[in-house]
């Protein structure tokens, strides 16, 4: 993890619903605990991190302090565009240009324009010299990127616009962003998955897409919510014997209610235990698929509880500190 945290930008992405925000938050906690001024960036109108830390969201475009050395930001493409234009041409002309029908049409209609603007803002956050002199830079920026397909589109937007514009400020800015994304010393990529066939397949496709578009690959794959393998072979055999030895359930008679309840409990418990074992074995088989493809894999234990709260994310951060 030390080498990862030495980069300026870490991109966290993967299949939808696998826990990308959870993992990005956990890495943010870990980096902050190590004294790095850290920012976790959300996109696509997401602003969930303040709530995790018991705070009210400040709205898109506001860098919010979550705790010592840790901030969050939900990128607002319109605000980012205004900041960029003001940096290029001054406050007044920037506002005029941003409000012009030409630029509004460009950002609304040009495919990938909002993605490019978001990536430009993320690039700016990694710089020691920010667009506004009073803004302070960060040691590490964590991008909680969209799911795989949208993330790849977002990451390739600088190259697309550089090819379209060729010269001028858009081409120059796109080149700077692309250089960051392709620099292994400054930028790293983490895939997040779960132990399912679809998530593993999408992780493989993500790695291939990064290599194709950016000549980069995944530094590691973090497999979230992995169930423990609790039972030995002998214990599984004993569970099978217990399940097979319980007679078929019938309606209890007045004199057999206690035995009926005991048999019912035994059957339910053994079936549940065997189902959990089968699920865990399936997950570990999927993790083995990733390892056979030479990915560095880190498994995150399933967090049991009514909800995934800050203590659970802290436990994940502690686990990552030991494994990466």
Task: Label each residue range with its predicted role.
Residues 27-29, 57, 89, 206-211, ...:
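Short, solvent-exposed amphipathic alpha-helical segments in soluble enzyme
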Residues 29-99:
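N-terminal phosphate/diphosphate-binding loop that engages ATP/GTP or pyrophosphate donors
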Residues 2, 18, 22-26, 33-34, ...:
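Conserved catalytic-core segment of NTP-binding enzymes
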Residues 83, 89-126:
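ATP-hydrolysis module of ASCE/P-loop NTPase motor domains
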Residues 293-324:
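NTP-binding/hydrolysis catalytic cores, primarily Walker-type P-loop NTPases
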Residues 1-7:
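Phosphate-binding P-loop
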Residues 14:
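The Walker A (P-loop) glycine that initiates the GxxxxGKT/S ATP-binding motif of P-loop NTPases
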